[in-house]
A protein has these predicted regions:
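Nucleotide and nucleotide-moiety/phosphate-recognizing core
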Residues: 1-149, 157-173, 180
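ER/Golgi luminal nucleotide-sugar-dependent glycosyltransferases, focusing on the catalytic module
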Residues: 189
Length: 189
């Protein structure tokens, strides 16, 4: 995994949760720790924490957005410029149950693909914030967030992407955005 960095999107205040999702826990581990561990398990050493507002108890750098308020693309743009490798595994902090094996399969496909981005798809749902992007997209991202709305899918369509079709159970991809989902997931774990 020498050629791949990892970006964990840990910014974005959660208005619906009323607190930072990164610091929510399942079985005593924070969502952020769970995602970091997946990266480490995959052998990735260049891990960047995008927009994390908590206290940095981690050995990885926190990268602030260069253009705040631009959503996930703003976070990615800043991180892509700091990443040490030509590819970046991008993972939101709010999908803590995604198995490392699925990410490994996603990485394998992206390293053999000509597409500039390969995102995970399950049961017809495309997940742009679970993907492998080429870091050379940083300038195109800058253009997207400064000249246009900074919409992730519009950006992907413009630059070309393909999907890795996951056969894993949909539950693994639960996006934990509100207290009800969190209670359900934490309770079932």
């Amino acid at each position: 995994k020498k050629e791949i960095s990892m970006i964990i999107l840990a910014g974005g205040a959660s208005s619906r949760m009323g607190r930072d999702k990164s610091d929510l826990t399942i079985d005593g581990k924070t969502f952020l720790e769970m995602q970091i561990e997946k990266g480490e398990k995959l052998g990735i050493s260049d891990i960047l924490l995008s927009g994390y507002h908590g206290e940095n108890k981690y050995k990885y750098p926190i990268i602030p957005d260069r253009f705040p308020g631009k959503g996930p693309l703003g976070g990615l743009e800043a991180c892509f410029r700091k990443a040490k490798n030509p590819y970046c595994l991008v993972l939101g902090v709010d999908v803590p149950l995604v198995p490392a094996e699925e990410l490994a399969a996603l990485i394998r496909q992206s390293l053999h693909s000509d597409a500039k981005a390969v995102i995970l798809s399950h049961g017809g749902h495309e997940e742009p914030l679970m993907g492998v992007y080429r870091t050379e997209l940083a300038d195109a991202m800058l253009e997207e967030i400064t000249l246009r709305k900074g919409a992730v899918f519009a950006f992907l369509r413009k630059n070309g992407y393909e999907c890795y079709e996951s056969q894993a159970v949909a539950w693994y991809f639960s996006n934990i955005n509100d207290s009800e989902t969190y209670k359900e997931i934490a309770g079932n774990h």
